[in-house]
């Protein structure tokens, strides 16, 4: 994946207020789907849609934890370190480099 495509994917994932709230919610600790949905004040289904987009962009990573005592699996989500610097000069350089 080119740098310009990677940047576009991250910016797209960050382009929704609910996804920004999810990022703020899991900033300090990983959480499972219900915790995130409850903290953000949205349904599980909507949280899952937004988390999927964040995970696809590499901003969020998930892992499955199986609680043996309860015999159920929970998917935990955690924020991945990221830092985005954008300027017209950087964009021009990356577009020229990628040939797009």
Residue ranges and their predicted role:
Residues 56-71:
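Beta-hairpin "wing" of winged helix-turn-helix
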Residues 12-18:
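Short helix-coil-helix linker/hinge
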Residues 1-11:
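Short, Lys/Arg-enriched N-terminal segment that forms or immediately precedes the first helix
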Residues 68-100:
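Conserved segment of winged-helix/HTH DNA-binding domains
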Residues 17, 28-32:
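Short capping segments at the starts of secondary-structure elements
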Residues 33-34, 45:
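Residues within helix-turn-helix
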Residues 22, 35-39, 54:
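A short acidic, leucine-rich amphipathic alpha-helix
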């Amino acid at each position: 994946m080119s740098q310009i495509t990677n940047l576009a994917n991250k910016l797209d994932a960050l382009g929704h207020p609910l996804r920004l709230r999810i990022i703020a919610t899991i900033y300090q600790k990983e959480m499972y789907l219900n915790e995130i949905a409850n903290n953000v004040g949205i349904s599980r289904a909507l949280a899952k849609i937004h988390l999927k987009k964040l995970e696809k962009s590499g901003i969020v990573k998930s892992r499955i934890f199986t609680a043996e005592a309860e015999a159920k699996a929970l998917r935990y989500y955690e924020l991945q370190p990221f830092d985005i610097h954008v300027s017209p000069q950087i964009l021009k350089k990356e577009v020229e480099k990628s040939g797009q």
